[in-house]
Structure formats: structure tokens, C-alpha cells
């Protein structure tokens, strides 16, 4: 349990900043407590200190399936005028792998002068790709962000794609099941939401090895090998069908 009084009691003449780190890839269930960023920000302001939120992953649009109920969006946090906030360019933001720091202009200017930036700065290609992602956000063209597009797909859409697979492969070899999935990648730990999966019939462990050799990652659930349709892009569907047919012996 971490309370705001723990922060307050730790402040002394050497304190410069109060920091909060998001639980990106784990969660503590049961009798636990942490400090809301708003309360940390207020305490920092009251003591003339900087505040820094290491968000890990950040999102902008309202998330489906109530996934954002316990997570602040980037917009909500920035409205609090944080001294500094950092988050990943990939993960929920859905762009290239990069670290993004936002906050007070004077603090950002100081960070730019740090010699470590010469080693950590990204190249022009990364910046240009990140720029295109940000443009998509500004235009609210979320379908241009593959991570968000997959996340926002309805169960009905996924069911239609799975049915197409089953019709081509054959019901004797696979079945469509309702399942639950996770965002993964250090985001929204233990937050499950609905998906549709294709159960490839056969021994699960053997199938997993064969698909992995073909560079296809599925998962084993209830001793069944599953392909999660919330992870399948339209551009790879035909190739994936060919791989499935090859592995199960239809080709």
C-alpha cells in the first residue's frame, strides 16, 4: 500500500521531484492502494516541487470495452499541467518504438542539453513515422493506427472473419470460439476484453510448435491451440490460411 502521506513524509530539504511510475506489466490485487496522479501533483505544487509521471504507455481516444475505466488518457493527464510525463511511442499509442517526454518547456529545454541525448535520440525515419501517427490522431483517423484499429474491432466483425477462415479451411479442421484477450506489451495489466478465436483441431503443443516454425504465434487455452482474430491484419489473412492448410495437411 502506498499513500499520499508516504510521499509527504519522505519530503526533505534535498527533495526536488515527486515521481509516480505506472504499473505497466503487472497489477496488485486485493488489499492494496496507490496514489492518484492528481493527488501527487497537488502535493508537489504545495511544496514547490517538480512532479513526474512515468506513464509507460499512453492512449488518446476513449478505449472500448471499458478498458479506460482505471486508466487516465494522455489528454486527461496533460490537462493537469504535469512538470514532466513520459510514455512509449509504441504500445497503446500505436506508433514506432520510441520514448516520448512532454511537459514544461523549460524542463524539456534542459533535457535537450543533456549529453545522453546524443546516444538516445531517434533518427529521421523514426521521427517521420511518429509524425504520421500524430497526424492521424489529430485528424481522428484512428483506423490508420493498426493497434487501435485491432482494439476497436467489434466481436461481430471478428466473427465474420473467423467464419470466412472456417469456410475455406473446413469445419472438420477448426472451430470458432468466443474467448478473452489482453492488450499485452506492457499495457493494461490483467484487463481482459472479448475476442473471437479459431481453434485448430489437434494436439495443442504439437500445433504450437509447427505454427511457431512458420512464424505464426498462437496460444494454448484449455488445451486448445487458438489463433486470436484481434491480432490478425487483413493483409496477412490469405497467407495465414495457406499456412494453416499446409500444417493441417490440406496442401
Where does each model-flagged region fall?
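Conserved PLP-enzyme active-site core in the AAT-like
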Residues: 1-135
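Short, glycine- and charge-enriched coil/turn segments that flank and shape catalytic ligand pockets
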Residues: 46, 170-172, 205, 246-251
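Short acidic (Asp/Glu) and glycine-rich catalytic loops that position anionic groups and cofactors
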Residues: 56-57, 106-112, 138-147, 189-192, ...
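A common structural junction motif
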Residues: 119, 212-219, 246-251
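Conserved PLP-dependent catalytic core of the aminotransferase class-I/II
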Residues: 124-127, 131-184
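Conserved C-terminal alpha-helix-loop-beta "cap" of PLP-dependent enzymes
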Residues: 159-235
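Short, low-order "capping/linker" segments at domain edges
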Residues: 232-244
Amino acid at each position: 500500500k502506498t499513500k499520499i502521506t508516504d510521499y509527504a513524509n519522505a519530503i526533505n530539504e534535498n527533495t526536488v521531484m515527486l515521481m509516480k511510475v505506472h504499473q505497466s506489466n503487472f497489477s496488485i490485487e486485493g488489499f492494496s492502494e496507490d496514489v492518484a496522479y492528481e493527488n501527487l501533483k497537488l502535493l508537489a505544487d504545495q511544496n514547490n516541487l517538480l512532479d513526474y509521471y512515468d506513464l509507460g504507455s499512453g492512449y488518446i481516444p476513449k478505449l472500448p470495452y471499458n478498458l479506460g475505466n482505471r486508466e487516465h488518457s494522455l489528454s486527461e493527464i496533460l490537462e493537469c499541467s504535469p512538470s514532466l510525463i513520459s510514455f512509449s511511442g509504441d504500445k497503446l499509442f500505436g506508433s514506432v518504438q520510441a520514448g516520448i517526454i512532454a511537459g514544461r518547456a523549460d524542463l524539456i529545454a534542459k533535457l535537450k542539453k543533456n549529453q545522453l541525448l546524443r546516444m538516445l535520440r531517434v533518427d529521421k525515419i523514426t521521427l517521420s513515422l511518429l509524425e504520421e501517427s500524430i497526424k492521424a490522431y489529430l485528424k481522428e483517423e484512428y483506423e490508420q493506427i493498426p493497434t487501435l484499429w485491432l482494439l476497436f474491432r467489434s466481436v461481430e466483425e471478428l466473427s465474420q472473419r473467423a467464419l470466412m477462415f472456417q469456410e475455406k479451411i473446413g469445419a472438420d479442421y477448426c472451430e470458432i470460439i468466443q474467448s478473452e484477450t489482453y492488450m499485452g506489451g506492457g499495457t493494461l495489466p490483467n484487463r481482459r476484453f472479448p475476442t473471437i478465436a479459431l481453434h485448430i483441431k489437434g494436439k495443442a503443443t504439437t500445433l504450437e510448435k509447427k505454427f511457431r516454425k512458420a512464424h505464426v504465434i498462437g496460444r494454448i487455452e484449455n488445451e486448445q491451440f487458438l489463433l486470436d482474430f484481434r491480432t490478425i491484419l487483413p493483409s496477412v489473412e490469405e497467407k495465414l490460411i495457406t499456412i494453416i492448410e499446409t500444417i493441417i495437411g490440406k496442401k
